C-alpha cells in the first residue's frame, strides 16, 4: 500500500501537455519566476507561430511605387527554323548579357513564398494581366485597388534586325499597352516624367527615352502639392512635389510597373539574312521575368506573396510589405510562454513513466538498510539547487556580455551621429537635412547592471543554502560512499550476535527432544517395559 501511494505521488500528471518545441523557453520562464527576477516586469515582443496565418501584408504607398527598384531576368529560346545565322545570333546574345547590368544573373525562384496572407488597407495601384496559357500568380479583388492598370492581353512584341545590326542592344519598340479607368489620368506637362535616372537607366533601359510632353497625372493618387505621373513611353511612374526643387529623387534602373508589364510580353528577335535575300529569319525569343530588387518588398497577388513574377504571368498584383503577426505580451509575464495554451496544442497520449517508480523503489530499498536512500534524495535536491545557481551565473554573464556589446554599439552610433551632424552643420544637422524626426537612444544600462547584480546575489544565496545543513550533505555523501558497501555485512553480523544464542538454544532443545522420541520408539518396538525416566535406577 505504501509503495502504491509513493508511485501515485511521484508519477507526473497526464492531463496537461506542453508542446515539445518550447522546452528551452519554459525552463527560462521557470527559472526567472523561481528566482523572482525583475525581468518579469518587462514587455516582450512576440510573433505568432501559426502556419495558417503567418503574417499581414501592407500595400506600398504611391511614392514607393516610384522608388522601389525591380530587376529583370532573361531566358531565351532558339527558333527551331534558325538557318545560317548561329554565329551572329550568338554575338548578339553575348552583347545583351554583357551590357545589361540591370539583368539578374542568377535565375530567380518562382512560386509563392507566403500563403494565406491578408492585405490590410487599400492598394493605391494594382496591375492586371490576362494571358492565355499564362502562369496564374493570384488575383486581388477589385475592391482593394484604388487604380488598376490592365496590360493588353493581345499584344506581342517583335524586333527585326539586319545582319549588320547585331552589335546594337535590342529594345522594345514600344512598351506593352496598358489601359486604365476613364478619368483616372490627366494630361500634364512635367519635366519629372524624364526622371533623374541613375547611370544604368539611360544606357540600358529597354524603352525609348521619355518625352516630358507626354506625361499623365494619376488624379486619384495626386494632390495639389504632390503629383504621381505616368510616362506611357516607358511604363514608368514618377513622383513630384511641387513645393520642392528638381533634385528630389532618382529613378531606379527598372521601375516596378515597367518590370511587371515587360514580364507579360516577350521580345522576338529576327534578322534579314544576307544569304537568303530579304526574307526574315527568326533567331530567338527573349522571355523576361521580373523580381523586386529592393529588400523587404514583395508582389502581393491575392493571398499569395511572390518575390518574382514569371514571364507570361496572369493575375492581379500590387506591391507591398509583409510583417509577421506581432503583439506585445502582458507585462506581468516573464516570457510569453502561456500564449501557447494547451487548448491550441495537440494532446498526446503517453504511457506511465517508470522513472518515478524506480526512484520510489530505490528510496524504499534504502530505508530497508539504513538512510542511504533519503541521503541520496537530499543530495539530489542540493545538487539541483546548485545547478540552478550556476545557471543563473551563466545567464548573468551572458546578459553582461550583451549589455557591453550594446554599450559599445551605442558609442559607435553616437560617434557617427556627431560626425554626420558636423558634416551637415550648414543644413542644421542630419535630422533637418533628412527632414525626419530625430531619434535618440536612452541609456538604461545602469538598470540592467543592477538587475544582473541582484541575480548574482540570488545565485550566491541559493549556493550557500545548498552547501549548508546537517553534516554538509556533499561531504557526508563522500563518507557514506565508503560505508555503504559494508552496511550489509555489518547488519548481518549484528543480527547474528543478537539472535545467535537464542537460535542455538532453540536448535539444541529441538535436537534433544527428537533423540528422546526416537529412543522411546525403539524400546517399544523391542517389547521391553519402558523405564520411567523420572525414577532413580537404585
Curated annotation (Swiss-Prot):
Specific enzymatic cleavages in vivo yield the mature SU and TM proteins. The CXXC motif is highly conserved across a broad range of retroviral envelope proteins. It is thought to participate in the formation of a labile disulfide bond possibly with the CX6CC motif present in the transmembrane protein. InterPro entries: TLV/ENV_coat_polyprotein. It is found in: Virion. Coiled coil: none annotated. The record marks 350-351 as: Cleavage. Pfam families: TLV_coat. Residues 500-538 are cytoplasmic. The keyword Isomerase does not apply. This is Syncytin-2. It comes from Gorilla gorilla gorilla (Western lowland gorilla).
Amino acid at each position: 500500500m505504501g509503495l502504491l501511494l509513493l508511485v501515485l505521488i511521484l508519477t507526473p500528471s497526464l492531463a496537461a501537455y506542453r508542446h515539445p518545441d518550447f522546452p528551452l523557453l519554459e525552463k527560462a520562464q521557470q527559472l526567472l519566476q523561481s528566482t523572482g527576477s525583475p525581468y518579469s516586469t518587462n514587455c516582450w515582443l512576440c510573433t505568432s507561430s501559426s502556419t495558417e496565418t503567418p503574417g499581414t501584408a501592407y500595400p506600398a504607398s504611391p511614392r514607393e511605387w516610384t522608388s522601389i527598384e525591380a530587376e529583370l531576368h532573361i531566358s531565351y529560346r532558339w527558333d527551331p527554323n534558325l538557318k545560317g545565322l548561329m554565329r551572329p545570333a550568338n554575338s548578339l546574345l553575348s552583347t545583351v548579357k554583357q551590357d545589361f547590368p540591370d539583368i539578374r544573373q542568377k535565375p530567380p525562384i518562382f512560386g509563392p513564398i507566403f500563403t494565406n496572407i491578408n492585405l490590410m488597407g487599400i492598394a493605391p495601384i494594382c496591375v492586371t494581366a490576362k494571358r492565355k496559357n499564362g502562369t496564374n500568380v493570384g488575383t486581388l479583388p477589385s475592391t482593394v485597388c484604388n487604380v488598376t492598370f490592365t496590360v493588353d492581353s493581345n499584344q506581342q512584341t517583335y524586333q527585326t534586325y539586319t545582319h549588320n545590326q547585331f552589335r546594337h542592344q535590342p529594345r522594345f519598340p514600344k512598351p506593352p499597352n496598358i489601359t486604365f479607368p476613364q478619368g483616372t489620368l490627366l494630361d500634364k506637362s512635367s519635366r519629372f516624367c524624364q526622371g533623374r535616372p541613375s547611370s544604368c537607366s539611360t544606357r540600358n533601359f529597354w524603352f525609348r527615352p521619355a518625352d516630358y510632353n507626354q506625361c499623365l497625372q494619376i488624379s486619384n493618387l495626386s494632390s495639389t502639392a504632390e503629383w504621381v505621373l505616368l510616362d506611357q513611353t516607358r511604363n514608368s511612374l514618377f513622383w513630384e512635389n511641387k513645393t520642392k526643387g528638381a533634385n528630389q529623387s532618382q529613378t531606379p534602373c527598372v521601375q516596378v510597373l515597367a518590370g511587371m508589364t515587360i514580364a507579360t510580353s516577350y521580345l522576338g528577335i529576327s534578322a534579314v539574312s544576307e544569304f537568303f535575300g530579304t526574307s526574315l529569319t527568326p533567331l530567338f525569343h527573349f522571355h523576361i521575368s521580373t523580381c523586386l530588387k529592393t529588400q523587404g518588398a514583395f508582389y502581393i497577388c491575392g493571398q499569395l506573396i511572390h518575390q518574382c513574377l514569371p514571364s507570361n504571368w496572369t493575375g492581379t498584383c500590387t506591391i507591398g510589405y509583409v510583417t509577421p503577426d506581432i503583439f506585445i505580451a502582458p507585462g506581468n509575464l516573464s516570457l510569453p510562454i502561456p500564449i501557447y495554451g494547451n487548448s491550441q496544442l495537440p494532446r498526446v497520449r503517453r504511457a506511465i513513466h517508470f522513472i518515478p517508480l524506480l526512484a520510489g523503489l530505490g528510496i524504499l530499498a534504502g530505508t530497508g538498510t539504513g538512510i542511504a536512500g533519503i541521503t541520496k534524495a537530499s543530495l539530489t535536491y542540493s545538487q539541483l539547487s546548485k545547478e540552478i545557481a550556476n545557471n543563473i551565473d551563466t545567464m548573468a554573464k551572458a546578459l553582461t556580455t550583451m549589455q557591453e556589446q550594446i554599450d559599445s554599439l551605442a558609442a559607435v552610433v553616437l560617434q557617427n551621429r556627431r560626425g554626420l551632424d558636423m558634416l551637415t552643420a550648414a543644413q542644421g544637422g542630419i535630422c533637418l537635412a533628412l527632414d525626419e524626426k530625430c531619434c535618440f537612444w536612452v541609456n538604461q544600462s545602469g538598470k540592467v547592471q543592477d538587475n544582473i547584480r541582484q541575480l548574482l546575489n540570488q545565485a550566491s544565496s541559493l549556493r550557500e543554502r545548498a552547501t549548508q545543513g546537517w553534516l554538509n550533505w556533499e561531504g557526508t555523501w563522500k563518507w557514506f560512499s565508503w560505508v555503504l558497501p559494508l552496511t550489509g555485512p555489518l547488519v548481518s553480523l549484528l543480527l547474528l550476535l543478537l539472535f545467535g544464542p537464542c537460535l542455538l538454544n532453540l536448535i539444541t532443545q529441538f535436537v534433544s527432544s527428537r533423540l528422546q522420541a526416537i529412543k522411546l520408539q525403539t524400546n517399544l518396538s523391542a517389547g521391553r517395559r519402558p523405564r520411567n525416566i523420572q525414577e532413580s535406577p537404585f
